[in-house]
Amino acid sequence: MTIRNQRFSLLKQPIYSTLNQHLIDYPLPSILSYWWGFGSLAGICLVIQIVTGVFLAMNYTPHVDLAFNSVEHIMRDVEGGWLLRYMHANGASMFFIVVYLHIFRGLYYASYSSPREFVWCLGVVIFLLMIVTAFIGYVLPWGQMSFWGATVITSLASAIPVVGDTIVTWLWGGFSVDNATLNRFFSLHYLLPFILVGASLLHLAALHQYGSNNPLGVHSEMDKIAFYPYFYVKDLVGWVAFAIFFSIWIFFAPNVLGHPDNYIPANPMSTPPHIVPEWYFLPIYAILRSIPDKAGGVAAIALVFISLLALPFFKEMYVRSSSFRPIYQGIFWLLLADCLLLGWIGCQPVEAPFVTIGQISSFFFFLFFAITPILGRVGRGIPKYYTDETHRTGSFS
């Protein structure tokens, strides 16, 4: 190949070379398990949500008198509209399932530790953006649960000292949840997924700066292989399993993860007996309800994300992987069970004994983050698998 042909070769073009560097030739530890495939699955979920959302927006009308009927029009009259809506609605649930598994994998293998602090913090920001996007999207069908969920959650901003009431009025566009609120939420719901794409690309770039963690929790530049074709084929297994799982929900149980009250048009004069958010908000909602004071509940929610953001900056542990930390491993599984319990409590009425159980579960949730720095310094177990760098430096960083 001549010098001129080399200059104009496809491999030399900036866009292709970047894709080749991050998606094809990117080196990964050879011992990665299937738990490392949820990042790519999250990307697939985000693409599904954006594509289906754009087509749904073509037929949706953001007006309080027309929104509910426009959703029914999509379901009944638009060609393939039912499939678009069920893919979008259940796709949100799949997205959160994948991301929750991704987060818990990071907690189990301490993927947040140095030098990947920025990767973890970006992931927490992405998680927060997902919650905001999903919440305002849940309002758009303008059913009973949409309307009253928007009323309850947005009114929480009034707990902010001095400016709280002003923020609530600004969010509503008036003195109650109404047409201005719906228009604002529709605009934001269309915008935020593209911000999520940008944040995800930053997350990926930050990850590739230092490379992925591995099940052993030790650093090595020696035993690595290219993403393509090895991990592409490995991830492909997860993609197929995900497609089957996703299809079961779409075609056989499309409304199971929703709430039947949302098939009733919004009525400001009739309050549902029990206001429940989508299932993926339930653990956080349970923490919010476990504190009777509104300001305390809002502070607890803020503390959830502050705890996640602060996790990488605790004192570094001797060994990252929970495979060699039996005490932390036991506490981790208790945390997982606690989060499932919080999810169940979140959909129960605000009465005894559910309130008490929610308070105990919320206490343990925060206790986990409080004792994690201590657990990082006890139960030291040295892996038998050393890399050349570990021998040379005597560290597991």
UniProtKB/Swiss-Prot annotation:
Co-factor binding comment: Binds 2 heme b groups non-covalently.
Top-rank taxon, per record: Eukaryota
Keyword rRNA-binding set for record: no
A Pfam family of this chain: Cytochrome_B
Gene3D superfamilies, per the entry: Cytochrome Bc1 Complex, Chain C
Protein's UniProt keywords contain Secreted: no
UniProt record similarity statement: Belongs to the cytochrome b family.
Protein name: Cytochrome b
Organism ancestry: Eukaryota, Viridiplantae, Streptophyta, Embryophyta, Tracheophyta
